[in-house]
Structures are given as C-alpha cells and as structure tokens.
C-alpha cells in the first residue's frame, strides 16, 4: 500500500494509482487546506460546494484506480480532521464518520467497490464509538466495506499493549473488523506478535455454546454511558471503579504505585493482616472487623440477611441471576456483585448478565471478575484488557477483580489500573500518546520516551504527546496537555495543548525544557 501525506494537485495520487496495488488517502487533507484549528462558518450551499470540490478531484483518481485495478484505503484519523469538518461537527465521532462517508458515497456513486476503511483515534473511547457509529451509518445506507482497526499512538510497553487491546479487542468482540494493526512505539517487528496473540484470543471463542440473552431496550451501543448503580460504601454510583486484588494465594507483595482498594484473602484469618487493608473474606471465615467484609457464593445467597455488615460481596455468574436472586439483590442494599464467568465467551456471558440486571431494574453495584492462568505477562495484558475493556466501554462495571495463576499478583494489579486508565474510567498515572515512528522521525523515539517517562511519570492525570514529526504530530496528539514533536534533525518543538510555544529547541535540551514548560504552567508536582 502507498501512503500519500499531502498532494497539492492530485498528481502523486494519480501517478501512484497506476503503479501500486492500494493507495491510502486521508479525507482530512485530500482537498481541504492543512489543518489550522480555525473555526469556519459555512452556509449549507457553501458546505455542499466544498463536497463538490472533493468529487471534482476524487473522481479522476478513482477512474485511474479502476483502469489499473487499484484499491484504495480511506484512512480517517481523529487528529487530522479538516477545519471544515471540525467547524461543523466538532472533534467528535460524528465528525470522523461524516468525513469518511463523504468519500464513501462518491465511491458508491461511481461504482467503485475496491475500498477499505480505517478510522482511528488514540483515545479508545472515541475510537470504539466512532467505528460503531460508522458501521451503523454504513448499514443504514446498505454499505459493507472492509474495516481496518487500530489505536493510533498507543505508546509502548504495558500501556501500548493494554490500550491497543482495549480498543481493537472491544470491536473484535462486537464482530467488527477485518484487519488490525497494533501501533507500538517500539521496533516494528514487535507489533505483529502482539496483534497475532490478540486475534488468536478472540478466535478461541468461535463456535461457543449459545448464550440465551436479550439486549436491554433503549441501550445504545454508540452513545454509551455508565450504568446507574446505587452506592454501597463508596462502590458504584459516580465513584471511580474500584480495584480488588486476589491475594488468596498468600502473596502479599505490593507495588505502592498500584495499590488496590480491596484485597481478597479467601479463607485467610484477617487478624493476621494489618488494619490498613480493606479485606474480602469468605463468608464462613469472616470475623467482624471494621476493615473486613464477607464474600458469599451463589448457594449462600439466602444467608446474606444474617450478616450485619455495611458491605457484603457475592460472587455470581449470568446463570445465577434467577428471579429469586434478583429479588435478593434488590432487597439487600449492602451487597456488591462480583460478576464471574466460566463461559468460553466470557465477555458475551458478562454482557448478558449486565443487560439482565438493566431489564430487571436491579441497580446493585457490579465488580467485573475474571480468572486466567497465564505465565506470559503480555498475554495476560491483552486478554484482560480486551475482556474488561469491552464491558467498561459499554458503560458496565463499578470495579475490577483479576485473578491469575502464573504471575505475581502485582502484575494483575498493574493490569487493572492500566485498563481503567486506557478506558478513561479511572486515571491513576501520567498518560503518554506516542507514535509508532516512521522514516520522518529524526530522533531516537524509544530512548526519548524513556527519558520523558523518567522525568514525568509521577504527574498523575497529565497527558503528554511524544510525536516523531511535524507532519502529523500536532494533530495526532489528540487531547494531550503537552507535546514533544520532532521539528527537524536534532530539533524539537514543544506544545501546550494545540499551540506550539517553543520551536526548534536542540534535542539535548528538549526534555529539560519540557519539564520547565510544565512547571511554568502550574502542572508540576514534586
């Protein structure tokens, strides 16, 4: 496939259409001027005239593609929407879909079917909503083009894998997507094994036994919002999702950057543990203590009423949600559900359970619970992120509980916090938006990312874009608070939001100047 970044008069597009198998175009700059973040006012007639300009330029290119059997990829990126689209729709999924549909409608009118679509964002919430909206819009117009999935600027290491699995995995769980790319700020050869593991995991659930379920009336898969649940001791409602760490194996080593809110100790005696931990204890081993709470299983549900405690947990699966169980959950205002699954399609089973609770009008808080047996940390990251991420982006889940046999418990804790960060449901650390690098990157991206992380990783909630070049960097940083963008060999430009505030800084001074910029704007903490 041939990528064209900017082509002022369509020449490069037309020449490449006769020489390669596929050409990628970006609707954000195909006809519209380079993005300036300006607000433009159009009458309906003027707006229609702008779309006609697209047709005048696009149709000759399509004709060359037809003559040579060349396919095209319409690649819409959240960070490179045109000022025209931004002015009418804002920086929204609706704007991304509108930008794509302008070109798709011309393709259909010109009887040109050889089209692949990619529509990407670095924000997983935006990415998933946009693709779901695009599919809905295409289906309404009887369009069925292949979709390529990806999370742009996902970053590196654990964060890059988790963010990619949340976005791509959610859509694959929906049955959406024909090809994928995992974009990591690492050596290119690192991407393919990660993508393969993710696809293989989703395929494991093929031909699973059917799940008999219904979607709650009025549930909108595009405009999702968090399910309304009652509050039980700070769990549910508008409180951030909690993290429950399974320490029933006796592993009590902690990473104090990823401290869980609760720990499950099973049959362990709570008297053997310090008072500063909030503990889940199997109900029949529970002792009345201010920091200990009983945990029941489905067969013990009738015993819930016998325990005088402000917070109780019960582990349930979809199949446990009988009419009687729903009555118990509605009546007892101190209970929180740990929603588990043993089904091969665990996401489908847990989705079914959440919709059953919605339809029953049961507002019990729900902590999503999964069990894995992975010695491969990367596989654990991908599997848990794809599964939990799907439900969180649907608006489900007042907390997470991840148990894994094969790795230390702190690995599971970091995964849970990373997934909540990637779904933007709970922010616990600095977020980095970094590109996968390309030939335009004229500095050592991986080393630079490591240096910036070392200097800024304590700035909880701050978003920092680290981009290879000036061509796509400013746009692709999305909603970053600060940006570090390559400006030429040995030179860096720094951004505050979308504004370039320092240009052509020597690379050796750039990280220090970034820290200084953050301090000057009052966003630094020691």
Where are these regions (language model features)?
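Non-catalytic positions within long, well-ordered alpha-helices that form the structural scaffold/packing
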Residues: 15-16, 108, 172, 255-256, ...
């Amino acid at each position: 496939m041939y990528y064209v970044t900017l082509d002022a008069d369509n020449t490069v597009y037309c020449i490449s259409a006769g020489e390669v198998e596929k050409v990628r175009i970006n609707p954000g700059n195909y006809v519209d001027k380079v993005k300036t973040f300006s607000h433009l006012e159009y009458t309906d007639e003027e707006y229609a005239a702008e779309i006609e300009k697209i047709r005048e330029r696009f149709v000759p290119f399509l004709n060359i593609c037809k003559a040579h059997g060349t396919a095209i990829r319409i690649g819409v990126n959240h960070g490179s929407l045109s000022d025209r689209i931004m002015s009418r729709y804002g920086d929204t999924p609706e704007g991304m879909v509108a930008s794509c549909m302008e070109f798709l409608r011309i393709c259909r009118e010109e009887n040109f079917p050889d089209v692949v679509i990619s529509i990407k964002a670095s924000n997983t919430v935006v990415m998933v909503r946009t693709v779901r909206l695009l599919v809905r819009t295409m289906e309404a117009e009887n369009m069925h083009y292949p979709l390529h999935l990806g999370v742009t600027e996902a970053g590196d290491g654990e964060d890059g894998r988790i963010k990619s699995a949340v976005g791509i995995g959610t859509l694959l769980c929906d049955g959406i997507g024909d090809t994928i790319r995992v974009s990591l700020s690492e050596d290119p050869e690192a991407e393919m094994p990660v993508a393969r593991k993710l696809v293989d995991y989703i395929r494991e659930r093929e031909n699973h036994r059917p799940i008999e379920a219904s979607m709650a009336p009025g549930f909108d898969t595009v405009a999702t919002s968090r399910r309304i649940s009652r509050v039980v001791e700070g769990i549910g409602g508008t409180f951030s999702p909690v993290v429950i760490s399974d320490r029933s194996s006796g592993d009590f080593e902690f990473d104090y950057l990823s401290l869980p809110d609760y720990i499950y100790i099973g049959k362990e005696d709570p008297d053997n543990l310090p008072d500063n931990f909030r503990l889940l204890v199997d109900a029949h081993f529970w002792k009345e203590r201010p920091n200990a709470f009983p945990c029941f299983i489905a067969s013990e549900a009738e015993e819930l009423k016998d325990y005088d405690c402000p917070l109780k947990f019960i582990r349930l699966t979809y199949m446990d949600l009988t009419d009687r169980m729903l009555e118990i959950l509605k009546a007892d205002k101190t209970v929180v559900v740990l929603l588990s699954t043993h089904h091969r399609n665990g996401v489908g089973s847990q989705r079914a359970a959440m919709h059953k609770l919605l339809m029953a009008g049961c507002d019990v808080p729900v902590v999503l619970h999964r069990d894995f047996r992975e010695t491969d940390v990367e596989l654990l990251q991908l599997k848990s992120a794809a599964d939990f991420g799907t439900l969180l982006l649907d608006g489900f889940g007042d907390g997470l509980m991840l148990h894994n046999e094969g790795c230390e418990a702190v690995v599971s804790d970091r995964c849970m916090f990373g997934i909540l960060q990637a779904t933007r449901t709970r922010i616990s650390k600095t977020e980095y938006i970094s590109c996968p690098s390309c030939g335009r990157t004229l500095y050592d991206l991986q080393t630079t990312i490591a240096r910036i992380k070392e200097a800024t990783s304590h700035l909880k909630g701050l978003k920092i874009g680290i981009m290879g070049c000036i061509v796509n960097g400013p746009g692709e940083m999305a909603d970053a608070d600060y940006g570090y963008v390559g400006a030429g060999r040995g030179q860096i430009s720094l951004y505050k939001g979308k504004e370039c505030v320092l240009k052509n800084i020597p690379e050796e001074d750039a990280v220090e100047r970034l820290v200084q910029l953050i301090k000057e704007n009052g966003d630094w903490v020691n």
